[in-house]
């Protein structure tokens, strides 16, 4: 199985960029945004309360991102260690919202909640994000997992996309939602969950 070292492992600090070292993304006014990892956009109420408390304590602007995460904006560089201490103590880690690595795995509600879902897209997205988080790459990359062919997670517009079928998952590669939008190309049809992970 393919594995890569986690971006925050000991001894890897020398290859980090400024934003990587700060575990935050510098904004245009010189402050930073802090974006903890929230696999598949799932967050327990207790963790949500921690984000609210941190944002309140440090007077941060809070925004739900297009990547189904919660961004906190306006942090000063000297505040970052204290912010991350609170977040790490609550079980969060960096969402690498700034690095050349896996940004996120976006998911729809899937078969757990949606009447159209034919596979557990949330469970698959959590598994993929936990499996590939911190993976370094030449450029940022994103996954999308849709629980049916309605495509609510925009899976075909991601670098790697999965769309559930009644027999498994269709795997799409090479999608792009940026300046030159493109649908990914179908790579594998009806793959099992084990095959796509």
Regions found by a protein language model. Give the residues of each.
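Mobile "lid/hinge" segments at catalytic clefts and subdomain interfaces of large enzymes
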Residues: 142, 147, 151, 156-197
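Compositionally biased, intrinsically disordered low-complexity regions
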Residues: 13-16, 32, 73, 163, ...
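N-terminal basic/disordered segments at the start of proteins
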Residues: 1-44
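Short, flexible, solvent-exposed loop/turn segments with mixed acidic/basic and small polar residues
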Residues: 23-28, 58-64, 177
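Small-residue-enriched alpha-helical segments and adjacent helix-cap loops
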Residues: 8, 34-166
